[in-house]
Amino acid sequence: LSEINFSKIIVALDGSEPSLDAASYAIDLAQLYQSELTALYVVSVRIQDDFDSDMPDEKMSESVRKIMEEAKRESDPWFTRIRNEMSPESAVKLHTKIIMSPKKVSGIIVDYAENMSVDLMVVGTRGRSGFKRLLLGSVASDIVTYAHCPVLVVK
């Protein structure tokens, strides 16, 4: 275990308590390993192309821009909570990212993590649509199934 190094960690957020609990674990691990931490929010929408929060405004249609603005408004408190939870003297570099896509949320998260060469993914057991009877939500289950790296599932 002494050889384990999580230099890049990603936590998937949707605003649910399990996802925010997962963020707390991700913060602790990122601080322990002095990792880069990305808090990712994926918005599933019926659009033709993928858009992310770093895209220039002129490339987005008005309706897409409105959806992105709403996603930013919705996720800002989550991202602020994560920033506030981090130790002030932490060496962790925090990134926040919003991606809108018509594709499956779990697929976007897995693809993004792989493209960014993430070493650890952290997810909550269930998201906002989570049924209490399910131990593991469909997004978390798919991430565990298809991830290229270890996945920590937080209950």
Question: Where are the regions that the model predicts?
Answer:
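General small-molecule cofactor/ligand-binding pocket signal
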Residues: 40, 95-99, 152
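A short acidic, glycine-rich active-site loop
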Residues: 59-77
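Small/aliphatic-rich secondary-structure junction motif
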Residues: 2-62, 87-89
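Gly/Ser-rich helix-loop-strand patches that form or flank binding pockets
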Residues: 111-155
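Short glycine/serine/threonine/alanine-rich loop segments
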Residues: 35-36, 92, 118, 149
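Aromatic/hydrophobic pocket-lining residues that form π-stacking "cages" and hydrophobic walls in ligand
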Residues: 26, 82, 109, 143
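Structural beta-alpha unit
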Residues: 1-4, 84-121
